[in-house]
Amino acid sequence: MAVFLEAKDAHSVLKRFPRANEFLEELRQGTIERECMEEICSYEEVKEVFENKEKTMEFWKGYPNAVYSVRDPSQSSDAMYVVVPLLGVALLIVIALFIIWRCQLQKATRHHPSYAQNRYLASRAGHTLPRVMVYRGTVHSQGEPSGHREAANSPQVVLGPSRGGRTTVRLESTLYLPELSLSRLSSTTPPPSYEEVTAPQESSSEEASVSYSDPPPKYEEIVAANPGADK
């Protein structure tokens, strides 16, 4: 449905009502206070108008419609002087605790060897070769029978279990040297030197007189030379 009005009726509907300062409305510059009172301003808008931090903070502190509060930059710098030393002290405490823990760990490992070292020592002890123990036994008296002496002088082999599932063989025997043999060993002449052994030997006079080209002696000659051989 279209509605058409005459000019007089149309002006009565689309009429503009001017303000109280009708003539000075366009000449008078608006202030930030009036604009922020009529509307809700943000901190960035106030900062663009004043272009000064001190004036901006002064207006913002007294502004009733402030949506959020803005901290003073000087207060944040003061807080840094408190936070930084606290962080440094906390870091030093953590480093000290780590050093103490490392020292305690090293002491514990020195007193108690590791599992790998224990296995190495156990395997090394299990693969050791059997030992042959030779000791000097007591000298028996002359009145003992020869059977006991032979039993005492004969070696004894003892078998026993060992580590690693193997058997150890222990040879027990009594080794001693009589005094007579010691005296004989001390009175014997030393062996000849290398020069004496390698020196050319001189042939004796008997060997020189015997001629190997002569025929062997006969049986009668041998019997005549040794008459007591037949007896």
Curated annotation (Swiss-Prot):
GO biological process: blood coagulation
Segments on the Extracellular face: 20-78
Processing after translation: Gla residues are produced after subsequent post-translational modifications of glutamate by a vitamin K-dependent gamma-carboxylase.
Record-linked InterPro entries: Coagulation_fac-like_Gla_dom, GLA-like_dom_SF, GLA_domain, Peptidase_S1_coag_factors
Annotated keywords: Disulfide bond, Gamma-carboxyglutamic acid, Membrane, Transmembrane, Transmembrane helix
Modified residues (4-carboxyglutamate): E22, E25, E26, E33, E35, E38, E39, E44, E45, E48, E51, E54, E58
Membrane topology: Single-pass type I membrane protein
Disulphide bonds in the chain: C36-C41
Name of the featured protein: Transmembrane gamma-carboxyglutamic acid protein 3
Organism encoding this protein: Homo sapiens
